[in-house]
């Protein structure tokens, strides 16, 4: 631990004790006072939280602290998520003696051998990391109300979740049936993002299978996402070196890759008859079920046996990979199917040749494929003459009947409509089927097993596909604030594609499904409205309510206002006043004002949060805002246990101290951006905080009581502007911008001020207090220490947001002086070796005010001599926008007095003595005839050269 880190840790521990003693972060309802209720996603205690968690919690903490300064009654609570498999899986792996995982936990988290031995018990593991993570949050300086802490296996919480699920079931939003889910073959259970390594949500997609048949009756089920292109198939591809099988599936003998047969076995009955290499099937001919054409089976090593069925159809007119491969073979045959504005008959050929792609191994084929597929899907229309290729092998009248259907629903239709039609038609005609797959594979369970898709029977699902529910969810997304705004489109897209989602499983910690024994509610389903539970758990415990008293009627009254307190209280055996007190607590804090989490939770938790709120709560209790921050990298790399580069939050605090760490996580990137945490930057920020500390000490120790000067007024005005910009940044959750303003720009202003004055004034101390209050949300312990040094009363954490008023005249004086210094330095005589500078001030400020934004006539009418008026107007036009604005706002300005006040500053900047004269003073010497050259804010300058 460095000396700097030690200093910051000692400061932090001091103020953490004092906050806890004063219960600064344990608010109670205060009717009539505005409230701000913010939550961040609670962590799984399957490891100590790391700096990625720390960033999310810091954003929430900064928002909470800022609102407290604005006068809000702020609630920021925290809990721990024990539910599901993340904890159980790690405990099982450790119990099994997995050396790699055990070494990871020792090296990354510093777990002792004794504790490792006990971690085969999932509850011990959870409680160990729960304690470590909570300690890390406290050391990090999060202003959390720990009096509301709970875990998701607490009996009170389980009663709450059972109430939630009964509500969803009674509204028809929980169903039982057949549906594809992500599945762990080892644990025989459905999985979601929180059950997988790296929290990767299994994305389930659907292939259309098209049954091509060879002369022996073997079926080659090509898997495609573009079934509308089947009339243009010229061949099919098989990987000659891959492992294939002949298997019975859906009453047919099929050729499948061995891997595909395994994956399909979770979706239906698959019986492997024999194994084979792919080359056994190369050279055969198969019948296209739509066109009746016999097409060859070609070998292609680019076919991935782990994708689809390992059997691929080739459409070279509309698939760049197929065109390039067949061109390499000299076997190109092009059949046009789709018209797209801006492309010719054969889009794939056109794009491949335009991009200069030379072979089927060219990486540019990926880009070519994206272009063609996107253009055809969004703007493509199936050609009318495609009908002539349909079913020529069928006898009449079947041929005409099929063609009539295709003419009506396929030819001339947009690609999207044609795709839907032909997928359905193939299945109904027995010429094709469906296969589900993990489209973002590989996805691994936390146990290390690769996830597959299983079609479950009699599984419980939350039906996020229900249309009315989707519409309410969209309505909330449109009404609420989402930061960053660009994330709104991702929420709407997620709402669109969400369908049934498995909500219960048969293993893991959690809440039993209330109406069906043997099922446990899964972790992404029991964590959607728990923000409401924070508002009441403290009162439930304080009033001594037992879990069995937390009935459906209890929750209906507390959260929905249904029934009367007297009747409900009588039935559950509590005091009606106690029940009303719990209801008032919820009613005061809800709705949630801001939900903070990582952007990776948009496709699951955050969208489920939206769905469940609109399903259960009345509109006035719907959440108001979501903030989704980016990831945290470390030294340019993604953090992962396998790389051993995960930085636990408690270790980071010990390494840098909490406030330098907070400053770095705030300043390194804006909220929506991914943040690259670098050691060098953390150390720079630590040094910057020490510079601020030394500056504030100097200011406090040397300040004197005296009349305010131009310099004092300038300091207050500059600080007022910095604080206004910081306030605007905080309000928009632009933490980086706020941190730059407060940690660097404000420090530069105070440093310059101290360089200009002999002794700082007491008003400078007041300006520093204002600065410290604005700093507090980012570096709270450090701010408290500075607040104490400056003589602030109470806590900086609870001080009101400062009200400093900028003085436009003081700002104008400083801008004027800086312009003068620049003018002098640009004069050749100064550069040649100035010995002394004489400055002649024209005090007719009103002439300049008249000239700004006006014309020569206005300047003359204000009293300016005609021979000067044109120069005045030209000078006014040359001033920067800020200075022009200040001149328009400042009615009276004593240029001579301002310059006298800044004389020491000017002499220091120029490095020579400076004499200041009034241009209209007859007693002043007219050196070089510069009296008449002076204009308001543009003095005459004479330089004596030595």
Swiss-Prot record:
ATP binds at residue 641. The lineage of its organism: Archaea, Thermoproteota, Thermoprotei, Thermoproteales, Thermoproteaceae. It is an enzyme of class 6 (ligase). One of its GO terms (cellular component) is cytoplasm. The keyword Cytoplasm applies. GO terms for molecular function: aminoacyl-tRNA deacylase activity; ATP binding; leucine-tRNA ligase activity. It catalyses: tRNA(Leu) + L-leucine + ATP = L-leucyl-tRNA(Leu) + AMP + diphosphate. One of its GO terms (biological process) is leucyl-tRNA aminoacylation. Its EC number is 6.1.1.4. Transmembrane segments: none annotated. It is found in: Cytoplasm. Belongs to the class-I aminoacyl-tRNA synthetase family. A motif ('HIGH' region) lies at residues 43-53. This is Leucine--tRNA ligase. The keyword Ligase applies. Keywords: Aminoacyl-tRNA synthetase, ATP-binding, Cytoplasm, Ligase, Nucleotide-binding, Protein biosynthesis. It comes from Pyrobaculum calidifontis (strain DSM 21063 / JCM 11548 / VA1). InterPro entries: aa-tRNA-synth_I_CS, aa-tRNA-synth_Ia, Leu-tRNA-lgase_arc, Leu-tRNA-synth_Ia_arc/euk, M/V/L/I-tRNA-synth_anticd-bd, Rossmann-like_a/b/a_fold, tRNAsynth_Ia_anticodon-bd, Val/Leu/Ile-tRNA-synth_edit. A motif ('KMSKS' region) lies at residues 638-642.
């Amino acid at each position: 631990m460095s000396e700097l880190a030690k200093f910051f840790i000692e400061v932090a521990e001091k103020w953490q004790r004092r906050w806890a003693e004063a219960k600064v972060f344990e608010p109670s309802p205060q009717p009539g006072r505005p409230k701000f209720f913010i939550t961040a996603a609670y962590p799984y205690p399957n490891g100590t939280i790391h700096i990625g968690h720390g960033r999310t919690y810091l954003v929430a903490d900064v928002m909470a602290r800022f609102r407290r300064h604005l006068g809000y009654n702020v609630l920021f609570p925290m809990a721990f998520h024990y539910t599901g498999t993340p904890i159980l899986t790690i405990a099982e792996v450790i119990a099994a003696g997995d050396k790699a995982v055990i070494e990871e936990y020792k090296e990354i988290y510093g777990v002792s051998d004794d504790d490792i031995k006990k971690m085969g018990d999932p509850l011990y593991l959870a409680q160990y990391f729960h304690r470590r993570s909570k300690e890390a949050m406290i050391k990090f300086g999060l202003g959390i109300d720990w009096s509301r802490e709970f875990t998701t296996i607490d009996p009170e919480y389980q009663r709450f979740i059972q109430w939630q699920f009964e509500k969803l079931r009674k509204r028809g939003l929980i169903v039982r049936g057949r549906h594809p889910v992500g599945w762990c073959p080892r644990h025989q259970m459905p999985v979601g993002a929180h059950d997988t390594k790296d929290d990767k949500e299994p994305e389930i997609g659907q292939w259309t299978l098209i049954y091509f048949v060879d002369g022996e009756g073997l079926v080659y089920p090509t898997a495609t996402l573009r079934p509308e292109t089947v009339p243009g198939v010229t061949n099919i591809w098989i990987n000659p070196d891959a492992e294939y099988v002949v298997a019975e599936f859906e009453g047919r003998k099929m050729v499948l890759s061995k891997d595909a047969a395994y994956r399909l076995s979770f979706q239906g009955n698959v019986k492997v008859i024999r194994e084979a290499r792919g080359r056994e099937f190369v050279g055969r001919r198969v019948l296209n079920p739509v066109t009746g054409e016999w097409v060859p089976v070609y070998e292609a090593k680019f076919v991935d046996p782990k994708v689809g069925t390992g059997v691929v159809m080739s459409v070279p007119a509309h698939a760049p990979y197929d065109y390039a491969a067949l061109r390499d073979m000299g076997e190109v045959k092009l059949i046009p199917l789709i018209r797209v504005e801006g492309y010719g008959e054969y889009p794939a050929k056109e794009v491949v040749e335009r991009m200069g792609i030379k072979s089927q191994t060219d990486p540019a084929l990926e880009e070519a494929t994206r272009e063609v597929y996107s253009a055809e899907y969004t703007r493509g229309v199936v050609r009318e003459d495609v009908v002539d290729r349909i079913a020529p092998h069928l006898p009449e009248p079947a041929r005409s009947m099929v063609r009539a259907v295709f003419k009506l629903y396929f030819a001339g239709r947009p690609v999207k409509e044609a795709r839907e039609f032909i997928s359905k038609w193939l299945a109904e005609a027995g010429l094709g089927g469906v296969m589900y797959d993990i489209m973002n594979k590989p996805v691994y369970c936390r146990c290390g097993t690769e996830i597959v898709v299983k079609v479950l029977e009699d599984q419980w699902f939350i039906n996020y596909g229900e249309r009315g529910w989707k519409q309410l969810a969209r309505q909330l997304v449109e009404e609420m604030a989402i930061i960053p705004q660009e994330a709104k489109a991702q929420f709407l897209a997620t709402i669109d594609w969400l369908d049934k989602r498995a909500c219960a499983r048969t293993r893991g910690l959690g809440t039993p499904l209330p109406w069906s024994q043997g099922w446990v509610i899964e972790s992404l389903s029991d964590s959607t409205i728990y923000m409401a539970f924070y508002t009441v758990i403290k009162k439930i415990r304080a009033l001594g309510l037992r879990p069995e008293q937390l009935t459906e009627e209890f929750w209906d009254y507390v959260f929905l206002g249904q029934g009367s307190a007297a009747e409900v209280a009588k039935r559950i055996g509590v005091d009606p006043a106690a029940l009303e007190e719990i209801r008032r607590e919820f009613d005061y804090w809800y709705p949630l004002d801001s939900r903070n989490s990582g952007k990776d939770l948009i496709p699951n938790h955050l969208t489920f949060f939206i769905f469940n709120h609109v399903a259960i709560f009345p509109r006035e209790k719907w959440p108001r805002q979501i903030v989704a921050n980016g990831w945290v990298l470390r030294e340019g790399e993604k953090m992962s246990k396998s790389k051993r580069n995960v930085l636990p939050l408690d270790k980071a605090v010990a390494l840098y101290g909490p406030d330098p760490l907070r400053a770095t996580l705030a300043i390194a990137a804006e909220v929506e951006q991914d943040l690259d945490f670098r050691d060098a930057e953390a150390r720079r920020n630590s040094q910057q905080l020490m510079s601020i500390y030394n500056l504030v000490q100097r200011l406090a120790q040397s300040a004197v009581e005296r009349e305010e000067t131009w310099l004092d007024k300038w300091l207050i005005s500059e600080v007022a502007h910095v604080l206004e910009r910081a306030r605007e940044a905080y309000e928009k959750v632009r933490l980086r911008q706020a941190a730059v303003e407060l940690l660097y720009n404000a420090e530069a202003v105070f440093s310059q001020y101290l360089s200009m004055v002999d002794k700082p004034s007491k008003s400078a101390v007041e300006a520093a207090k204002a600065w410290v209050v604005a700093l507090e949300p980012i570096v709270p312990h450090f701010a408290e220490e500075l607040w104490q040094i400056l003589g602030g009363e109470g806590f900086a954490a609870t001080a009101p947001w400062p009200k400093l008023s900028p003085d436009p005249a003081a700002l104008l004086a400083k801008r004027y002086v800086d312009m003068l210094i620049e003018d002098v330095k640009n004069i050749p005589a100064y550069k040649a070796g100035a010995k002394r500078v004489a400055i002649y001030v024209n005090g007719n400020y009103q002439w300049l005010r008249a000239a700004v934004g006006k014309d020569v006539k206005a300047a003359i009418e204000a009293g300016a001599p005609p021979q000067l008026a044109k120069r005045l107007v030209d000078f006014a036009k040359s001033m920067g926008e800020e200075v022009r604005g200040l001149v328009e706002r400042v009615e009276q300005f004593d240029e001579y007095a301002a310059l006298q006040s800044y004389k020491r500053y000017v002499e220091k900047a120029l490095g020579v003595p400076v004499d200041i004269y009034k241009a209209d003073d007859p007693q002043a010497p007219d050196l070089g005839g510069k009296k008449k050259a002076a204009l308001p804010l543009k003095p005459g300058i004479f330089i004596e050269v030595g």
